[in-house]
């Protein structure tokens, strides 16, 4: 008996010794990263209004920037909010694929496009905030990729709203132009953001913001119109609105408007410079509410897909295939535009170094 006890104690001692080696192992696996730096230590293009500390030093190797996923810096919250949200979208897709036949049901394709578009914009955004600090050309490249993701999501949202959410009366008003106009405005949004970023050294801050906000605002006004009409119809009827999907659509609009405010205005860091460098930035709040908007939007579309099938089959017929083709066309045009503007940026940076 004593021998058995001693063996158990010996094993515990060995396990304790192994546990002590874990921090050393983690330190070797994740080497100590350079400390973050002040705003004065990074080039102008990396600087954010009213954010003073927490910048990552440029011109490090790629491994460093990937490992900063686990470091505290002023982009950490921005990276993790959209990274975690993109994983939630994958889980949502897996859950929906158990009951929805995305391959053989053409009427499920717009919902698949919405899920793909949401995952794309969230993934591109997470990459931009994680890797853009490496160099000036990396900064422009990854944010242009982010803008392509935004354009893709804008069209994906427009398609889902038009296909599943629209009422018959509104469909009759907009059916001839809604999807082509949504595709054009999505591309215009990408173009405006890319050009605004490219020309930002020569533009006042508010003009740079206008290039981002105005095209996206126009796109949103069109894309959300089926949702607003549906909400109006539901709550203006004589009977109390009992449509659960409409409740989710109301939250979708509310969360988007809150996110748009914090995207447009640098609050609260403007009121407390240096106090919101790591957490509490307006852009971080924008990320959180945009994620909430996307998640309730997907839930609303799921309900509409399930409960309004007779209506959208009657309204759209075999439109889904054309809508998917337009999605691919919009994504390609946006990507080509971003590639062209990146080429202009690269030429500009090379001339600046000479």
UniProtKB/Swiss-Prot annotation:
UniProt keyword annotations, A-Z: Cell membrane, Developmental protein, Differentiation, Lipid-binding, Membrane, Oogenesis, Receptor, Steroid-binding, Transmembrane, Transmembrane helix
Subcellular location: Cell membrane
InterPro entries: AdipoR/HlyIII-related
Keyword Cell membrane tagged: yes
Pfam families per record: HlyIII
Taxonomic superkingdom: Eukaryota
Keyword tRNA-binding: no
GO CC annotation: plasma membrane
GO MF annotation terms: nuclear steroid receptor activity; steroid binding
Membrane topology category: Multi-pass membrane protein
Alphabetical GO biological process terms: adenylate cyclase-inhibiting G protein-coupled receptor signaling pathway; oocyte maturation; positive regulation of MAPK cascade; response to steroid hormone; signal transduction; steroid hormone receptor signaling pathway
Extracellular topological intervals: 98-110, 163-175, 266-277, 340-354
Cytoplasmic side: 1-76, 132-141, 197-244, 299-318
Protein's job: Steroid membrane receptor. Signals upon progestin binding, resulting in rapid activation of MAPK and down-regulation of adenylyl cyclase activity. Interacts with steroids with varying degrees of affinity, showing specificity for activation by the maturation-inducing steroid (MIS) 4-pregnen-17,20beta-diol-3-one (17,20beta-DHP). Capable of mediating progestin-induced oocyte maturation.
Family listed: Belongs to the ADIPOR family.
Name of the protein described by the UniProt record: Membrane progestin receptor alpha-B
UniProt gene name: paqr7b
